[in-house]
């Protein structure tokens, strides 16, 4: 229940009162069965977050930051988890800076979390590097289009692990564990950990080995095909009928 917190706490608390469970994957449905949920109340639909990309991602989207990154290999970064605060986050950021300093065609855009501790570390570790832009948090439309414009994603966030693969973007997860094991198994995600050398090595591999990049970017997203909301609506209509 504590890992990841508060997401797992919220999931279990809501699950106690829910009469229907719409699971994004079969593995998630199996987990609900192990918790004792009624199998007749569990439906595998995919994740509605993938559906949203059909409405938020646009070919004509304009943002000055993505314009700045045109012609480069853009890495979108997010980092904010409380378990990474302190030294783990510093190591993560140092690995990213090392990549930028080594590869002159790489630029980084990092919408920095509002947590003052995160901002302090980001300023200290990324300061003075003109190919790393620290920007204010983006809204969902802006961020989805940032992901689309990116070459790869480096994150410790949860939902991004499901959304980015739907856009064909490899995801390096800067954590030691993930609650999205389906993505790792499918090959859309790779756990890079929180050690500087490990993160640097995994990122460098994606930048220098086209076949590995291709396999990750073309892997099938296990979290749905963008039709979860349609499936849920049909289920609800049949229940109400």
Segments and roles (model prediction):
Residues 1-110, 115-241:
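Nucleotide-activated sugar donor-binding and catalytic core shared by glycosyltransferases
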